[in-house]
Amino acid sequence: MTRQLLCLGLVCGALGCSSSSSNSGPTTPGPSTPAAFSTSVRVTDAITGSTVSGVTASGDGVSGRASSLAGTMTVGGDSSSASARAVAFTRAGYVTRTVAMKIPGNEIVVSMIPSTFNLDAYDELLRAPRLQRWTSAPPLRVQTRTLQFTSINQSDAAAIDEVMSDADRLGLEADLSWALPQLTGNTFQAFAGITRDTIDVNGRMQVLNTGVITVARYAGLTTATGYWGYSRWQFRTDGTVIGGTIMIDRDFDRSSRSERRSLRAHELGHALGYTHVTILTSVMNASAVTEPNTFDRQATQIAFLRPPGNVRLDSDPAEASLNRLGAAVWSRGEGFRRR
């Protein structure tokens, strides 16, 4: 399945300058008046992790000098407030970053995206239209009994008289575990846990489960839909992903096709809340023939340095949004159609 490409713009930074009259020589800036309230900030490059100097902060009642060579700066406010205020961090060569920060407050790290990074592809992958992601490593539940496919929207499934071999199960778990760090910016090194279930023949299993990623083989998925895999994810309105389900066609998964690992990684991406990429090569291309690459690793690294709800260009949600759980819904889902 595909989705509509967002109409996107580009961002650039600009530097201002001033000049003195011809009768006066160079002037040395005097010491700035310290703000009554302040917060320490360290600015880093979201991809390399290196510090960024020359970053300026702006916002309502906000003051402060540009970040040092060590990437440090102090952001001051004209008053103290228990609520966070929007502060924009700007530097040429980087996308302007807007965060919600408390002044005064504890030291924060602000990561900035280089302007050379493909924001259009990033938006396709992760922000549709706002960032969706898990906030803690999900557990994985493997159903070893093959289930009967009836619909991409089915909430439960009947089990048939067929069980995944131990070798197939271990291979599936290994591929998903291999893909997880690469699809989470190395934030999640492993699933929170892996459990295996084998329900009785003709028993029924709930396939939409909160707090876990459920994966199973389905008989008849490709025949009915043309897809080798299909996945859905559950998310709150603030962008936090809290559940996922992965359907893999039984016949495809038992085959020795070269795309099997890339398909598994692709479907895991959907269960993590990601959508199809059309602009450049990615594990989340609808063809699902590409394993996680540099773009995927960098994009998810950036994403996991931002809270759910972050929007283009690079603006974090207000504190009120971060603290609101909101309702949870299941996505319509996306699939990998056979070629």
Language model segments and positions:
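C-terminal motif of bacterial Sec signal peptides marking the signal peptidase cleavage site
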Residues: 13-16
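Short, acidic Ser/Thr/Gly-rich low-complexity loop/linker segments typical of extracellular
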Residues: 51-77, 101
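Metzincin-family zinc-dependent endopeptidase catalytic domain
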Residues: 166-271, 275
